[in-house]
């Protein structure tokens, strides 16, 4: 969906099935690094959690490969839906050589949860400093030793050593920003303006939906998927129609 708004080149870490499907596409370089997707980070066995971490570590391989090719990298989890282009002011920040990384806070307003799972979400970030990545990888490899939540929690410690920028709330919009009594009212800020989804007074850029594969338990974010799909159905936006056709 990002390609509806921006010209993109991709490096993806994937399994054999995805490799066969995507490696023939001109602007995608596939790294066949994933052996199994029998993994999870929530309600899972220890073996599944270990497999989850193996998958998570492959994203660092993809990021480093992309940085070697292009000098910087915007990383995205595969379950992102872009509904507006990245704003020009943010594009200017991404190209600023004085900023080492751009990262996304969870913004749950639920401090005990963030103390456990991390202040930042690891599903979207931009990086240009290889030392940033090296430190993140080193801490992630030792996540059990330090009691970190997989590769995600180390991010909040690494960013302290660099010039980092927090992307605003209209980026990487996940269900966790709406799921407490104190934050549920944020759903009312999602609305249609000029046939586009807005989050308050800013265009909603992308949603992190957790919906592209079966997960074996209740998808706690289904309410957000339903919300954005219902909003898209009320518009005449051709890009949204393509997203809905893909999902349904």
Which residue stretches match the model-derived regions?
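A recurrent flexible, glycine/aromatic-enriched loop bordering the glycosyltransferase active site
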Residues: 111-124, 147
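N-terminal anchoring/stem segment of glycosyltransferases
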Residues: 1-45, 68-70, 224, 230, ...
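Short, well-ordered alpha-helix to beta-strand connector turns
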Residues: 6, 70, 99, 162, ...
């Amino acid at each position: 969906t990002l390609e509806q708004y921006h010209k993109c080149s991709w490096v993806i870490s994937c399994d054999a099935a995805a490799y066969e499907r995507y490696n023939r596409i001109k602007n995608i370089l596939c790294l066949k690094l994933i052996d199994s997707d029998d993994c999870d980070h929530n309600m899972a066995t220890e073996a599944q959690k270990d497999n989850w971490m193996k998958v998570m570590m492959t994203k660092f391989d993809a990021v480093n490969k992309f940085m070697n090719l292009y000098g910087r990298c915007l990383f995205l989890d595969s379950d992102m839906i872009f509904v507006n282009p990245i704003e020009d002011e943010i594009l200017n920040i991404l190209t600023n050589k004085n900023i080492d990384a751009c990262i996304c806070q969870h913004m749950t307003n639920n401090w005990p949860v963030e103390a456990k799972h991390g202040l930042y979400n690891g599903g979207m970030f931009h990086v240009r400093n290889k030392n940033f990545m090296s430190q993140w990888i080193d801490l992630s490899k030792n996540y059990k030793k330090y009691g970190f939540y997989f590769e995600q929690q180390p991010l909040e410690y690494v960013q302290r050593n660099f010039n980092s920028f927090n992307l605003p709330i209209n980026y990487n919009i996940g269900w966790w920003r709406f799921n407490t009594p104190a934050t549920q009212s944020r759903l009312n800020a999602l609305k249609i303006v000029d046939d586009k989804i807005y989050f308050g007074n800013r265009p909603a850029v992308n949603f992190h939906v957790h919906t592209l594969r079966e997960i074996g338990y209740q998808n706690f974010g289904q309410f957000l998927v339903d919300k954005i799909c219902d909003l898209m159905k009320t518009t005449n936006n051709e890009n949204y129609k393509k997203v809905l056709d893909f999902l349904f």
